[in-house]
């Protein structure tokens, strides 16, 4: 069976870069699906690390490999030589949509794409049309921009009005400079005479053409996400939970550095916004909440956790205060 080697994209963050190959190996195993890629793991050739795998039908997984979060180049191994294999880029937008914004607390872009990829691969039912993604902790839109890049329709909720305004300003400038056909507005939202905050609405057609994609972000409390979106349901819910360092949640009128209080209240709301067969993907700091505790919250919300094999190899160190892991669950 032919053997292939993936060269991992260099990472500006040294700590993440040192762990990226192992994370991408697990990502490939999840995203390729059972029996389509026999992943050997990380191997070294001439002092350079690669992800090694075998595939009898590479063409069947070519788009999956090209879409991995850290795939920089792919080679077919021929004895001691490496033959380059073309990476077919299927992204709908250039990667600078995700990489240009720089701000304190921004989650690593490569990891964000891994989180979205793994969650999407875990759906038990593929939608007949475009995939829809909700980030109920949207921040300044990294996950939403990754979703747009992958061709999804995206939506979010964010309590920080200034973060939404900053994301709106970036999008308007970016789309204008790229000369992409689009409509963008940020407007107040009122229902039954009450102000519910503001809504960012964007419709954009990628440079390559095709169908327009939709982005909607509400300002407000993520616990009210279902009320904000009404009957709308999503194929994916993807969120970067508070790490308890820069982020936090509010409980009983005080700042809570653990994500437990927020997730206990909000996760059942998010679960109800998933379509049947859809998947939820969370990244969180295991120093503030154990996997067992998070599993209990998810099962109590009617979700079915996916916690075996490569799903248990996605944990990694961020810094001395943060050990980040990935939790995935499906709505039956």
What are these regions (language model features)?
Residues 2-82:
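N-terminal auxiliary segments of SAM/dcSAM-dependent transferases
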Residues 1-27, 77-134, 138-332:
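Class I S-adenosyl-L-methionine-dependent methyltransferase catalytic core
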